[in-house]
């Protein structure tokens, strides 16, 4: 790319085994810096024992996974940008309840792998669900087939909805996921606007372009000689609220103007 930069990449679509293969392949190339986009890819690089400087972009719990010592002083050859904070779990529940007030039961779709920090999100969800009169049902998954079964199992449940927790697999399969959710006529909230772009009802999360731009700046600084241990991990400070109004109409949801006014973007 350009005259002095070569980029090699490998796509695993959230599959753990494929991610491990990608990690081994990229490490074998001995690059000057590695870039991990998701929890799964970062966990794979760590599992392979890489000592190559690494920047991550979407890791949920870098301290808990021992990628870094602290946000301010990573202390190792890894740094980057987190995209999620545990309190988002409760925010997703409250927004979904506001958009679809009839909801009484919420299925929480999540990947139980440690790197996804699902336990922290679930604790936040439970706390808000209890005060909102909503029953939250934890629905862990291991692959796309199990996610599909979970979604279908809720379609006959009265006043049910879905919360999708951060996960590389559901992001990679977002077209199939949102299509099935729509077929089952379930209100759902997602962690990235990518889902709303393909028919998802609502999302609340970071702006990916800003996260990637920040991560790219760290890659540039490392290539110019900076030590990852001295580059602080950056936590998100801004979140975007996206509503797909067309999907709301299909579901028969009447969205109040006050809610639409708060959205960063309304997709018609």
What are these regions (language model features)?
Residues 1-268:
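Short hydrophobic alpha-helices and adjacent helix-cap/hinge residues
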């Amino acid at each position: 790319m350009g005259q002095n930069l070569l980029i090699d990449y490998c796509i695993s679509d959230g599959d753990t085994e494929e991610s491990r293969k990608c990690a081994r392949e990229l490490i074998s190339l001995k690059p000057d810096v590695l870039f991990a986009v998701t929890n799964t890819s970062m966990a794979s690089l760590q599992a392979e024992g890489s000592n190559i400087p690494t920047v991550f972009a979407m890791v949920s719990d870098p301290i808990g996974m021992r990628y870094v010592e602290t946000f301010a002083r990573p202390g190792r050859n890894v740094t980057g940008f987190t995209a999620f904070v545990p309190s988002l779990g409760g925010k997703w529940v409250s927004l979904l309840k506001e958009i679809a007030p009839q909801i009484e039961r919420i299925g929480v779709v999540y990947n139980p792998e440690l790197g996804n920090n699902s336990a922290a999100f679930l604790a936040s969800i439970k706390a808000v669900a209890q005060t909102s009169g909503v029953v939250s049902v934890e629905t862990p998954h291991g692959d796309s087939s199990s996610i599909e079964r979970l979604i279908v199992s809720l379609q006959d449940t009265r006043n049910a909805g879905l919360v999708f927790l951060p996960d590389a697999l559901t992001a990679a399969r977002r077209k199939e996921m949102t299509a099935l959710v729509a077929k089952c006529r379930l209100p759902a909230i997602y962690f990235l606007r990518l889902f709303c772009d393909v028919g998802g009802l609502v999302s609340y999360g970071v702006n990916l372009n800003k996260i990637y731009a920040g991560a790219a700046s760290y890659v540039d600084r490392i290539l110019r000689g900076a030590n990852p241990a001295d580059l602080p991990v950056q936590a998100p400070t801004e979140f975007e609220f996206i509503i797909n109004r067309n999907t709301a109409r299909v579901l028969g949801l009447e969205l109040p103007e006050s809610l639409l006014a708060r959205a960063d973007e309304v997709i018609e």
